[in-house]
Swiss-Prot record:
InterPro entries: CheY-like_superfamily (IPR011006), LytR-like (IPR046947), LytTR_DNA-bd_dom (IPR007492), Sig_transdc_resp-reg_receiver (IPR001789). The lineage of its organism: Bacteria, Bacillati, Bacillota, Bacilli, Bacillales. One of its GO terms (molecular function) is phosphorelay response regulator activity. Keywords: Activator, Cytoplasm, DNA-binding, Phosphoprotein, Transcription, Transcription regulation, Two-component regulatory system. This is Accessory gene regulator protein A. The keyword Transcription applies. It is found in: Cytoplasm. The modification 4-aspartylphosphate is found at residue 59. It comes from Staphylococcus epidermidis (strain ATCC 35984 / DSM 28319 / BCRC 17069 / CCUG 31568 / BM 3577 / RP62A). It holds the Pfam family Response_reg.
């Protein structure tokens, strides 16, 4: 899930970015801070390119000709179930969100920093839960990567390949923009879906995310720029 922050106060924006990045890093959620800006048009343009639902933290009062509520209304035209959270110092403006029918997830008031952090994290947790539920309803294939006391849910389409780890009984999932170490078995992963193929003793690849194959050097290149080796026997089977 991609996260967008539109806030015209630079200090406030940087504080929100810090909260979001720390949450993603510590909790290892399948999320990415895609954009933090004071330009509502930049958020709108990038939101149109999403293949999945987004999560938007929007300041209601922006120093632009498009305020946060109007921005949310425009986002709703192409992301009807996205998570929209308004961040504001003006509680009296919240009624406008009902006028524009944007169905906001939450209203967070800036006045209390500790409350701000807690509410942002609550919204991210709720957005993550909604994403899992929507993925099941829309038959989007996901895999649970177990990391001991917690798990990370990842969509098949985000996986480039799996690799054996130097640590016993652990694997590394190479995703579009990050890596996750987890407990697993390559043999079992290769049997999950037809798109997964064990091309080497140490690798299971996602055929759907292959960019190209160098058969001579036995190297498989992926859409995110990474690569892995294939065995002599299996390179032709990919």
């Amino acid at each position: 899930m991609k996260i967008f922050v539109c806030e015209d106060d630079q200090r406030q924006r940087e504080h929100m970015v810090s909260i979001i990045k720390n949450y993603i890093m510590i909790e290892e959620k399948p999320m990415e801070l895609a954009l933090a800006t004071n330009d509502p048009y930049e958020v709108l343009e990038q939101s149109k390119e999403l293949n999945d639902i987004g999560c938007y933290f929007l300041d209601i009062q922006l120093e632009a000709d498009m305020n946060g509520i109007k921005l949310a209304s425009e986002i709703r035209k192409h992301d009807p179930v996205g998570n929209i959270i308004f961040v504001t110092s003006h509680s009296e403006l919240t009624y406008l969100t009902f006028v524009y029918k944007v169905a906001a997830m939450d209203f967070i008031f800036k006045d209390d920093p500790s409350e701000l952090k807690m509410r942002i994290i609550d919204c991210l947790e709720t957005a993550h839960t909604r994403l899992k539920l929507l993925s099941k309803e829309s038959n989007v294939d996901t895999i649970e990567l177990k990391r001991g006391s917690n798990s990370v849910y990842v969509q098949y389409d985000d996986i480039m390949f799996f690799e054996s780890s130097t640590k016993s009984h652990r694997l590394i999932a190479h995703l579009d923009n990050r890596q996750i170490e987890f407990y697993g078995n390559l043999k079992e992963l290769a049997q999950l879906d037809e798109r997964f193929f064990r091309c080497h003793n140490s690798f299971v690849i996602n055929r759907h995310n292959i960019e190209s194959i160098d058969s001579k050097e036995r190297i498989v290149y992926f859409k995110n720029g990474e690569n892995c080796f294939a065995s002599v026997r299996n390179v032709k089977k990919i």
